[in-house]
């Protein structure tokens, strides 16, 4: 039996670990500690949807009380979500470095949206909105999981890469086919073009997605146990970041539940929407923080400083800096929310295509501004 920490048996170590809280600093492997957006605990709940616990709780809320509260939350977060995208573009001056991606193509999208709307192509617009939303939300999960994966040096192997990509894309495909099979007539109350391939293929793809995700977690668990080798006391190396598989788990639960249940009750689509918006706001805020913020706060659980006075001063300084940054970050999300409220209040017919076009522009921009090229611009 393998010995850990200079003489502790693996069975003895396992019996001791439950007494240490999951998010305690001493429970975080050294290789993992520098690769969180904020901290292990915060990332678990906000970036990873509580590893799907939050998603299941939201579904329970709809079953017990309806979707009134969730609908209001979705409206607020969706507009803040759009504003966060504009904040990222302006803060990084992408309108100057990448004019085609952030100016010309969004302008073309708006013009086409207006043309389709004025031409009565509402079914086409609804269809685009449906399929683009699936792609956009799924790719966001991929991007957040990639953040953790690259922090550990990238995929462990070709097998890891294939299993990981399949665990993201297959639930997306299965969700689309399930929704179009169960609700071929309407999407969010509007007619659309359903991608129907038949019940047999739909359920085959669904079963394949479930088995693929199970295979990903089985391989990840096995790999993590094999790689968890203690080099010296207190220094444990891992090669697969837990944030990666937390995101994959939340992604699978979100798509597997929201689109299947959403076929009979559109309210369940709000669960995925709210999860997506919270994750995006959290990620964009974390990425917008100055580099100095990350040096001592990414784990969120540093050892106590011996001198309590120094610790108190440092904590106060960090809080003040965080508050200033949060205020700056909130400007564009608040502007976006205020604009949406004003548009709804004026109720002008010509603004309706602008809202749809703005959504399509957001989908496009989110796929462009978080690439390596954009981040290095």
Where are each of the predicted segments found?
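Intrinsic disorder/low-complexity segments
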Residues: 1-32, 230-232
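Alpha-helical transmembrane segments
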Residues: 42-58, 104-110, 167-172, 332
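N-terminal membrane topogenic signal
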Residues: 32-51, 323
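Membrane-interface helix-loop-helix junctions at boundaries between adjacent transmembrane segments
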Residues: 114-200
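Short, hydrophobic transmembrane alpha-helix segments
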Residues: 57-71
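Extracellular/periplasmic helix-loop-helix junctions in multi-pass membrane proteins
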Residues: 261-269, 338-355
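Loop-centered beta-sheet repeat module
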Residues: 171-247
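Central hydrophobic cores of alpha-helical transmembrane segments in multi-pass inner-membrane proteins
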Residues: 72-89, 135-141
């Amino acid at each position: 039996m393998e010995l850990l920490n200079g003489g502790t048996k693996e069975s003895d170590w396992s019996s001791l670990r439950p007494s240490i809280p999951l998010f305690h600093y001493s429970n975080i492997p050294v290789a993992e500690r520098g690769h969180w957006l904020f901290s292990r605990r915060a990332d678990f709940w906000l970036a990873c949807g509580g590893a799907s616990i939050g998603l299941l709780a939201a579904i329970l809320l709809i079953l017990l009380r309806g979707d009134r509260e969730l609908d209001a939350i979705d409206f607020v977060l969706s507009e803040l979500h759009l504003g966060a995208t504009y904040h990222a573009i302006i803060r990084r001056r992408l309108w100057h470095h990448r004019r085609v991606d952030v100016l010309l193509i969004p302008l073309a999208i708006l013009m086409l949206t207006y043309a389709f709307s004025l031409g009565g192509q509402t079914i086409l617009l609804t269809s685009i909105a449906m399929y683009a939303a699936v792609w956009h939300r799924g790719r966001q999960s991929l991007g957040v999981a990639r953040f953790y994966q690259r922090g550990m040096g990238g995929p462990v192997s070709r097998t890891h890469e294939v299993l990981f990509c399949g665990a993201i894309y297959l639930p997306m495909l299965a969700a689309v086919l399930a929704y179009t099979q169960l609700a071929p007539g309407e999407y969010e109350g509007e007619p659309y073009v359903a991608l129907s391939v038949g019940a047999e293929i739909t359920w085959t793809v669904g079963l394949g997605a479930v088995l693929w995700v199970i295979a990903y977690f089985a391989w990840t668990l096995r790999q993590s146990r094999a790689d968890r080798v203690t080099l010296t006391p207190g220094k444990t190396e891992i090669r697969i970041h837990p944030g990666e598989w937390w995101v994959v788990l939340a992604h699978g639960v979100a798509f597997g539940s929201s689109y299947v249940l959403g076929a009979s009750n559109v309210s369940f689509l709000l669960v995925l929407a709210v999860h997506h918006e919270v994750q995006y706001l959290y990620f964009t805020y974390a990425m917008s923080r100055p580099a100095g913020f990350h040096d001592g706060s990414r784990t969120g659980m540093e050892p106590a400083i011996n001198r309590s006075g120094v610790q108190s001063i440092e904590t106060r300084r960090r809080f003040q800096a965080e508050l200033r940054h949060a205020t700056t970050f909130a400007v564009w999300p608040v502007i976006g929310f205020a604009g949406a409220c004003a548009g709804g209040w004026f109720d002008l017919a010509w603004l309706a295509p602008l809202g749809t076009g703005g959504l399509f522009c957001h989908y496009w921009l989110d796929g462009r501004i978080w690439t390596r090229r954009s981040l290095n611009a």
